[in-house]
A protein has these predicted regions:
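Surface-exposed beta-loop interaction hotspot
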Residues: 1-19
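Short beta-strands and strand-coil junctions in structured, solvent-facing domains, enriched
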Residues: 55-58, 99-101
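Asparagine-centered strand-capping/turn motif at beta-strand->loop junctions
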Residues: 48-55
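Short, solvent-exposed beta-strand/turn "edge" segments of beta-rich domains on protein surfaces
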Residues: 35-40
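Short, solvent-exposed loop/turn segments enriched in Ser/Thr/Gly
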Residues: 42-46
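Intrinsically disordered, low-complexity Pro/Gly/Ser/Thr-rich segments with frequent PxxP/GP/PP motifs
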Residues: 65-105
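Extended, charge-rich intrinsically disordered regulatory tails
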Residues: 102, 106-119
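Long, low-hydrophobicity ectodomains and other hydrophilic envelope-associated domains
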Residues: 20-25
Length: 119
């Protein structure tokens, strides 16, 4: 169901973000997954899915977000316990320019299949 008409000047953009973001809200027990992004006038709005990973309520606080954002808003102020209908919400972030530059880089992943030679 589409409830809004296209807005002149607003266009979809590629967010160039990893499939899972761990550096955005490291203090909260949740997973963060990028959904979509839209741009206009040098700014970008990024929609991210937040899902609880614990069996208790998680209260969301935009002050705990890590990165360089113009503003942020959550669709809901809290997440329910994992596995409940309330365990997921959407976070909307506004960034200047490309969104991938506003996020803290993900830590380098070690190759689990690497073979280490010993001496």
């Amino acid at each position: 169901l589409r409830t809004l008409e296209a807005v002149p000047g607003v266009h979809p953009v590629s967010h160039h973000l990893p499939g899972r973001i761990t550096t955005l809200y490291p203090s909260a027990p949740l997973t963060v997954t990028p959904l979509a992004a839209w741009g206009a006038g040098g700014r970008t709005v990024v929609a991210l899915k937040l899902t609880s990973t614990v069996s208790r309520k998680v209260v969301l606080d935009p002050r705990a977000l890590q990165g360089n954002f113009v503003t942020a808003t959550f669709q809901h102020r809290w997440l329910g316990p994992a596995g409940t209908p309330e365990d997921t919400t959407t976070l909307y972030l506004v960034t200047e320019g490309r969104p991938d530059r506003a996020f803290i880089a993900e830590p380098a992943r070690r190759n689990a299949t690497a073979v280490h030679k010993t001496g």
